[in-house]
């Protein structure tokens, strides 16, 4: 590094000035390296751990150097390691030696595997090359013969020729014989004097002389450098020019001296002189010295170099080596077609880019990476050069190789500039410019010489061993005879085995003697111009056959093509001439010879690849093993270091612990002394206080005894008071319990009396209701019989009834037997104390189940109308009074709201002063009757409404002065009165044998599950119901028949049921003006065509769509009223003997017809009642709700009992479904007490 401070610059200038003036002072002439001793780091604490990367010292030139710490043992070990490394580097100076060692380490089986070459493998090598390169030479077929076909023919011909010579020849033996021929041809061409100086240098020494020659060359180089350091004072540029001139002059002088010496000295004297020199400087072994002298006498260049070493201490030798490298570089840079093979080989050998590409796994380096590599190598070589010993230290073989290649490569100028700059930066202050130039030149020459000598000698050993292995394989393959004959011929020609298989692998130096230049320079063994095929084995085994894209070499000893100097363009234009030349100019012998050489090269290439593959595989295994060993060693060192640190920490802890114990012991002694003194003082004080304490305790004891006596007396008084208080509290508690028991008993007695009274009143009302209903039924029966007799006798029906009345089915409901049993008990209790009705009516029969009971066949009366679609007259349906006894008051109200719209004669619903002409729209149609043999309905559970009070009937007759229909649609004619007595007797007998419904009727007159007392099994009946209960109906389940009457209006009466004329009706606009909502006008209903038909089943749907709800009715029903109605209906129809029975969802929905809810709304209401009413559901597999259950608890707004709600609507004797409207409020329930008062 250049000095930065002023003092250093002054010091350097003074040193240079002293050198220029030639100061004779012995102190000043001493080398600075002798004045500054070598500095070594000192360790003050040998047991301490010093970081190896933190020890810093100063170099002799002032630089700061960081080095690891070396103890005495480490120094000895390092010295031994350096000695061992030096010996190993001398014995294995290149990768070729490693490859040779690898071949020796292979087992015989592995060697056989490598040497076993098949025919297809040889042709694959040739084909792979042919795919990448196209050629038009004679060997390749002059563009019209396939290379593989020609080579296969040549191969078969050569194999047949060898087979004729030796019948035991096989492909493997044939391949080895071809390689042996290549070795023999190599030995024959070694005496060629046209080889270059570079090849002479590489071949003139054996492997045993390499180490000694390297040391001698370095010794001569150091002496020369010391002389040049004292002699040259010029600048670096002038020195370099002068050296070039001197080198040229020296070479001329050397040649002249050599010629003079040869003339003046005899051969014997020269041989003796050379022998002495060789024994002294090269090797003391006589055989080696003799071999060297023999080779030296054969090659004049070697003699010239030896004379230079003897006379001028090797200066001429170094200059010769440098000139050789320089000449090779100049020749490699020329792109002349006549370039020799040796020059191209030298170029390839010294091409640093190719070498770095091979080291980089076949990937070429970028320009930046290549420049960084050159700079690092320059700095490394500069730092490794020691000015004291004049040697390079700690330089690896790879660094030496890279340095040599960079110095002799195409970009050597730039690299040398880097070297010069690096040397100037480090040694400018110590060495002069001329010394720097000489040092660089000698270093480069030394490195080049070492590399060339190492490579040549190692290849000699390697090839010798390879030859032995081939011979061993031949013996194992029973092919010894041929190879023994070949060896017998070869041994007289060459004494050593250095010309074995290495001659096959070392092909780069045979090209000068075995080949002549072909116009296309075509050679088929390697393709060094291809970046993909350039690999490490080409460098190691020195098989670097030059190949430009249009240069191919062929060996032809006797024939030279006449087109050697012609350019490639002329060859392309003269393709036809070349084909003629191929056909006529070359004979079969030449083609066979060329083919044999191609096969030789292909086999050589295949052997190279196999050996390198085996080497890389073994190297990979060794690397893995080495890595594992290094990891294990690293772990061991780390573990030892940790153990050492742990021991040190434990030692420190023990030392600290002992110190702490000593401190604690001293402290304890001081504390004990203090405690002793303190105790003495305390004892004196305690004795004084003890006397005083005794006096005080005596006085205190007396006071305590007095206080204790007073406390005992106080405690006894408090215990007596507490005992008296507890006695008083016990007496008071007993009195309170007695009073509470008496009050509870009175309350229970009152409740019992109240329940008895309510039960008696309820039974009385039930009995009265039953009697009243029986009476009404009898009267209605008689009236219906009289009105139906003319129809039966005449057999005439209404021809248009099917167009004006819808098909209706009766309700179905499953009633609990518990309610019937309860009602039966109440009726029996009342009936037991009252006389039986004079009509022979049996109340017990009314409460029997209606499953198998037969009732008289009497259908509901109809109003016969002509076929006018605007007719609004309908049938009158009267509810059965018995149904009121089993339904709750709220159920009665809801059903009334629904069924009140089906009444035709609204005079039954109005006040007595109302007009008798008020009629209902014809929304519901009832089936006709045909006689006593007709069935009541297809559904056996259908029951007809047949109840009408005599008061209502009389009102209907009094209010109309003209001839009108009776309230049940029967005529007033007296022609049928004559048979009334007979009909009445028949009905009475039937009633006596039949029971009324076991279930209750709804307030609208349509009993859900009661059999008719007038029908037989074939009569048909229809009434308002859900769509799911219509017979043969397509109406979906859950559809409701909504009420259609908002207010009752009057309609004109008919004069006769047989009248075909139609009385003009009010139009829709008049109805809408009067707030009448009728769906019959928009949704026509259908009836059977014949009301007298005995088989009257309906085939048409009753309604085609859902009927809209009347806004007048829906406005009076709020949300809470709907929820209460659902809950009360559930309590009314659920059995009383079970706590929480499940009720079918359809049954509960059918009993809520009066609420005008569709099925989806009904389900939503039930879901909303889960929280407030404790509602629970039961679903099927599809998730649909099928049953519902309510907990029997009183919900919000339901404070009355079940029986109170069941009979709240019957408390008023005058309030019937035909005389009053039901309540629509939801906030209050129906009181029983007030009803009882009114009844009484």
Swiss-Prot record:
Residues 1-20, 514-524 have a biased composition (Basic residues). Residues 457-487, 558-587 have a biased composition (Acidic residues). It comes from the Eukaryota. It is found in: Cytoplasm. Residues 616-777 form a coiled coil. Residues 1-76, 446-593, 634-744, 953-980, 998-1029, 1214-1240 are annotated as: Disordered. Residues 25-34, 953-965 have a biased composition (Polar residues). Residues 39-48, 488-513 have a biased composition (Basic and acidic residues). Its main location: cytoplasm. GO terms for cellular component: cytoplasm. Keywords: Coiled coil, Cytoplasm, Phosphoprotein, Stress response. InterPro entries: Fungal_stress_NST1, NST1. Pfam families: NST1. The modification Phosphoserine is found at residue 266. PANTHER family: LD36051P (PTHR31780:SF10), STRESS RESPONSE PROTEIN NST1-RELATED (PTHR31780). Interacts with MSL1. Belongs to the NST1 family. With MSL1, acts as a negative regulator of salt tolerance. This is Stress response protein NST1. It comes from Saccharomyces cerevisiae (strain YJM789) (Baker's yeast). The gene is NST1.
